[in-house]
Amino acid sequence: MQTLADLLNTIPAIDPAAMSRAQRHIDGLLKPVGSLGRLEALAIQLAGMPGLNGIPHVGKKAVLVMCADHGVWEEGVAISPKEVTAIQAENMTRGTTGVCVLAAQAGANVHVIDVGIDTAEPIPGLINMRVARGSGNIASAPAMSRRQAVKLLLDVICYTRELAKNGVTLFGVGELGMANTTPAAAIVSTITGRAPEEVVGIGANLPTDKLANKIDVVRRAITLNQPNPQDGVDVLAKVGGFDLVGMAGVMLGAASCGLPVLLDGFLSYAAALAACQMSPAIKPYLIPSHLSAEKGARIALSHLGLEPYLNMEMRLGEGSGAALAMPIIEAACAIYNNMGELAASNIVLPGNTTSDLNS
């Protein structure tokens, strides 16, 4: 098996020549230049991804949901029982959760992956990549060893690349795990340098009178574990969780194939921050689906330099926002491939010349 360093070195650069050709093509379509706004920019971004061979298109779609428990749940940072992780993972196998319904609407397959659920036996119907029965309590110890983090990254990268070989061209990331907004906030605080109180939110409806404890837990975790903000693996291993590592692996795996990844909400932003520390080359492959309602969302997205396409006041997680945004990707591909051209209709708009239209 390749090492993580070897895999990171395989991530291709975006093709600027393909993007320039796409820009000229889009400017010559039956519309005023720029009138389809961010949809045009999205099509151009897709055209630059080597895995799509210069033509924006969508083949198979997949949302990969990483499921794991967190030792930090013991610190009272979540109101949901820890057992809900396993219950909801099982519900995902029945197709009844939010992400499953939205993914079905978008024509995407949901891959439910156990990377660290705290049950005695594996849950039937889940893809088993379990590292342990939940991560360590980051308030008193590292979430996991560096070796565990690297192995899980490699496993997920390889799984993602295999899906790409089988025709998946659009990936979405999601997660499931009680208390996981706490390690996500710790990652965001560590990498952005912002104080815990600026990035810690209520997660799954944590009462406001418990928020101070959650902020304190994040601060203690960072102080105790001393994650290196320049080392994405170190941050994930010390103050992250198996679900966050898994999402980072999907991003790295898809980017290594030159393919796009739709982010979800706050948890995925945290994973993206860590993944980009491992390989800044993945950033052009990341597409932000929606603006999470979680407190630190804007801070994380600003650090990533990303602007979401939707603002639906969602904070469910699971990959729900990624699934919801998949039709936007398909719309960008549709305008690129199916609209008529100005030149064919003998239309010359101000700012366009005949040579422009025929180039």
From Swiss-Prot:
Keyword Isomerase: no
Cystine residue pairs: none
Pathways per UniProt: Nucleoside biosynthesis; alpha-ribazole biosynthesis; alpha-ribazole from 5,6-dimethylbenzimidazole: step 1/2
Protein keywords: Cobalamin biosynthesis, Glycosyltransferase, Transferase
InterPro entries: Nict_dMeBzImd_PRibTrfase, Nict_dMeBzImd_PRibTrfase_bact, Nict_dMeBzImd_PRibTrfase_N, Nict_dMeBzImd_PRibTrfase_sf
GO MF annotation: an example: nicotinate-nucleotide-dimethylbenzimidazole phosphoribosyltransferase activity
Keyword Glycosyltransferase: yes
Reaction(s) this enzyme catalyzes, per UniProt: 5,6-dimethylbenzimidazole + nicotinate beta-D-ribonucleotide = alpha-ribazole 5'-phosphate + nicotinate + H(+)
EC number per UniProt: 2.4.2.21
CDD domains: DMB-PRT_CobT
Lineage: superkingdom: Bacteria
Enzyme class: transferase
One BP annotation, GO: cobalamin biosynthetic process
Residues the record marks as active site: E318 (proton acceptor)
Family per record: Belongs to the CobT family.
Alphabetized NCBIfam families for the sequence: cobT_DBIPRT (TIGR03160), PRK00105.1 (NF000996)
Biological role stated in the UniProt entry: Catalyzes the synthesis of alpha-ribazole-5'-phosphate from nicotinate mononucleotide (NAMN) and 5,6-dimethylbenzimidazole (DMB).
Subunit structure comment from the entry: Homodimer.
Name this polypeptide is given: Nicotinate-nucleotide--dimethylbenzimidazole phosphoribosyltransferase
Organism: Escherichia coli (strain SE11)
Upper taxonomic lineage: Bacteria, Pseudomonadati, Pseudomonadota, Gammaproteobacteria, Enterobacterales
